């Protein structure tokens, strides 16, 4: 990264806690199929990794916006289910299972991002720059 460069980061985050996505049991399908090896960062995650970069500015976007986005994606998916199932069939053996995994994923995201009026999980943007 050149000295005067800036980095813009867009993440989903939790208001307080960062946590790893680790499969807990056989029912933990969302972690297994969508988030394996991932992390849900906390809103202040970059404050803990500030050796090389510093946060110039940050913005939090209320989770209700992403809830509405997820709802719209589900509506669009249902409207185009035939084409989407063909696409899934090209990539997965079990197209219907994957179609319904995605449906439940969108439904879950819609609900999770509404919790606490969109203030529990939300989108954050960060502008970072190299430390001097």
Over which residues does each language-model region extend?
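Short conserved AdoMet
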Residues: 1-2, 50
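Short, well-ordered loop/turn elements at secondary-structure boundaries
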Residues: 2-3, 122
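Substrate-binding/catalytic lobe of Class I Rossmann-like enzymes that use SAM or dcSAM, i.e.
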Residues: 13-123, 129-132
């Amino acid at each position: 990264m050149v000295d005067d460069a800036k980095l813009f980061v867009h993440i989903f985050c939790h208001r307080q806690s960062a946590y790893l996505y680790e499969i807990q049991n056989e029912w933990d399908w969302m972690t297994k199929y969508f988030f394996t090896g991932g992390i849900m960062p906390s809103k202040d995650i970059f404050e803990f990794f500030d050796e090389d970069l510093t946060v110039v500015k940050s913005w939090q976007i209320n989770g209700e916006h992403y809830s509405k986005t997820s709802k719209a994606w589900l509506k669009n998916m249902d409207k185009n289910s035939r084409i989407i199932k063909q696409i899934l069939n090209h990539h997965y053996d079990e197209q219907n299972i994957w179609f319904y995994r995605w449906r439940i994923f969108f439904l879950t995201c819609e609900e999770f991002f509404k919790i606490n009026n969109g203030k529990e999980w939300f989108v954050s943007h960060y502008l970072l720059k190299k430390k001097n």
